[in-house]
Swiss-Prot record:
Compositionally biased tracts (Polar residues): 319-331
Organism annotation: Arabidopsis thaliana
Tissues and organs where the protein is expressed, per its UniProt entry: Expressed in roots, leaves, flowers and immatures siliques.
Disrupted-gene phenotype: Defective in ABA and stress responses.
Described purpose of this protein according to its UniProt entry: Functions as a transcriptional activator in the ABA-inducible expression of LTI65/RD29B (AC Q04980). Binds specifically to the ABA-responsive element (ABRE) of the LTI65/RD29B (AC Q04980) gene promoter. Binds to the promoter of FREE1 and activates its transcription.
GO molecular function term, any single one: DNA binding
Subcellular location, record wording: Nucleus
Gene: ABF4
Protein name: ABSCISIC ACID-INSENSITIVE 5-like protein 7
Up-regulation conditions: Up-regulated by drought, salt, abscisic acid (ABA) and cold.
Chain positions found as Phosphoserine: 39, 61, 110
Subunit field text: DNA-binding heterodimer. Interacts with CPK32 and the AFP proteins AFP1, AFP2 and AFP3. Interacts with FREE1 (via C-terminus).
Region listing for Basic motif, in residue ranges: 353-372
Motif (Nuclear localization signal): 340-347
Amino acid sequence: MGTHINFNNLGGGGHPGGEGSSNQMKPTGSVMPLARQSSVYSLTFDELQNTLGGPGKDFGSMNMDELLKSIWTAEEAQAMAMTSAPAATAVAQPGAGIPPPGGNLQRQGSLTLPRTISQKTVDEVWKCLITKDGNMEGSSGGGGESNVPPGRQQTLGEMTLEEFLFRAGVVREDNCVQQMGQVNGNNNNGFYGNSTAAGGLGFGFGQPNQNSITFNGTNDSMILNQPPGLGLKMGGTMQQQQQQQQLLQQQQQQMQQLNQPHPQQRLPQTIFPKQANVAFSAPVNITNKGFAGAANNSINNNNGLASYGGTGVTVAATSPGTSSAENNSLSPVPYVLNRGRRSNTGLEKVIERRQRRMIKNRESAARSRARKQAYTLELEAEIEKLKKTNQELQKKQAEMVEMQKNELKETSKRPWGSKRQCLRRTLTGPW
């Protein structure tokens, strides 16, 4: 499991390291490395090719998406190897206790990859970096990044993954959240962006490094860290529009800087502003059970977080996940309930029913027209047939009449034969 609950300070005792029972979390350093020192990011490309490269697998010809997938696969394999070794040690030595989870290599936070270089190969990105940075020995302000002598240019195989990803503009998403989690002053009841407790139980809610629940012994309060992809959606439309405009302007500036090469200008780090998580502020004593109202400091400089002191909850005006979901291709998109569609369901059903009725009427009218046309064609064919039969009968009748006329003419023209024989009168008789 990725997140942890710290029960070390419940009894009020000091930390084993001698730091005492302090409720204040020490702020992290200003430089946020991409990984721990023992991670894959500290390897150079040559070491990575010798370690993970196989026959037909060249990291220079991969695009940036495939490179990140290979790095994540190597991280998972290294994490499994490092978690199996402490487990075997704990089984062999039960009295030694459970090793702290801080020594294990957890899954790194998701990397934000700019869309302009997501489909480019590693060699193309390296050439772009060389053309934009110019000569390595002539660049100013780059001390400590490379151990290459000034007379020779650094090659891709000698560069570490961390330096390459930093110069290419690939940034971990949880760096911004860790910087937001730093605590200033004596505010012991605030929100901690990342818990540095060494032991405890784990509950995973997304990113392992950011989701932790810590119980402190002196302030009797619970500190809840939620993943950066979750948040409460409220009606801060003006702030959301302003933030979207700022993000669009930053993205356009980065696109222009990538498309227009500058020989003496270094590639800027692609860091998009992210909203802080939902935080629980200091509890306030309330005499009655009603709502106490908003505190004096409605906006506590938390990048759009509206604080309500009566309930002890700091609520984001907009969803933290929506600020970075539009600017990168690999960040998770939060699930936002679309409540506006519920009121239009009746109207949509009526419109859909009308459309179905119109379609049925059109189909029935087309069928009736087809039947009528077929009946008309059939009648026309019958009429043509009857006309032909009538013409044939009329021809036969005319021929018969002509034959009768001819016979009458022939009989009238026939000559008379011998004289008719008549009975003679006889004079002989008995009287």
